[in-house]
């Protein structure tokens, strides 16, 4: 039987997790697949070897010279200005992301989550609630598990994290519930302006209709304004306002008000994760799951049950009265500010990496108020140093390497302190991704225990 992709010449750009998953999916369906990545070179790892054995042609260290593809599939980390993508867009060759490719095959309803910060925690929290409510749930997307890997299986629901990069290449993607958490400057190296970034995020609801729901953060003016643009039904959440319709905080409890009826869900004291940003994530989770049809009782059980996610304010160990916390997923200044506001204890901060086009001014002011000592590391350490000096903060040292940064943090920390890895920058100057950075931090800390 001829399928949609049989004998079709398809170029997959980017040989990371989602690119590999897309190539594997397409080769199984009889496509002629070329997987290309200009940043990779030979020799290849076992997974790529296996793909090559299955018939995927690998072009690494550059792009194919013969431009004969009929469809291009782009990985989320690859800019649309890259040569083969720009060529395809100019020539009218279809360009899809891995999420769009998977969506065409998936039958399960999707709750999709986007925003600058809190995506991974909220996506995972929603997944936890749905599982407790009895739905066979897949948690996927920009969270380490490509959606395309899940299309062979039957699911009742999908909780999906989507980035602005992934939303750039959707065509028909239509989530049952779309969640927009917040918007602060990030990825301006790619989107150029905050408006361009907002526009990319707002693509999450472009294919919705009145049978779908758009969950928006009422406290973020830019996100709130999207309520006038979405074709879906709007359901707001707020930490600050008592809403006529939506999810909010009243007398220390999370409350849902819908169709004139009010229901208390949980006392905020009983939420398992610290910090005001996690209250925001919890409110978004309640709004999304309520919109999906989950009962208040099951939402409460799911909220309580959640253990948090790796690399996001993850407690690693307490050694000699010092708490070590891995927040490697804090890859922009706003995320690190939220991490700093999660603790009452004095903080020794490890920060630095590759800047994604952000200003460190506001973070520097927050560090001045909250941080006892800062260790600067990575490519943007000089930028951070300048920002700290501009606000009159001089309690910092510069580390020679990541290992040196952790060693210095240990030496500077006192009993009662938190040593917080929250870099406010990407990991690509020293690591493959933020996970690798976080894993090394955890290993170095746990070696202290054994040492």
Swiss-Prot record:
Catalytic reaction list: UDP-N-acetyl-alpha-D-muramoyl-L-alanine + D-glutamate + ATP = UDP-N-acetyl-alpha-D-muramoyl-L-alanyl-D-glutamate + ADP + phosphate + H(+)
Domain of life: Bacteria
Keywords assigned by UniProt, alphabetized: ATP-binding, Cell cycle, Cell division, Cell shape, Cell wall biogenesis/degradation, Cytoplasm, Ligase, Nucleotide-binding, Peptidoglycan synthesis
Pfam families documented for this protein: Mur_ligase_C, Mur_ligase_M, MurD-like_N
Entry GO terms, CC: cytoplasm
Compartments, record wording: Cytoplasm
Gene3D superfamilies hit by this protein: Mur ligase, C-terminal domain, Mur-like, catalytic domain, NAD(P)-binding Rossmann-like Domain
Single Gene Ontology MF annotation: ATP binding
Family according to the record: Belongs to the MurCDEF family.
HAMAP family for the chain: MurD (MF_00639)
The protein's name in its UniProt record: UDP-N-acetylmuramoylalanine--D-glutamate ligase
Species for this entry: Carboxydothermus hydrogenoformans (strain ATCC BAA-161 / DSM 6008 / Z-2901)
Taxon lineage: Bacteria, Bacillati, Bacillota, Clostridia, Thermoanaerobacterales
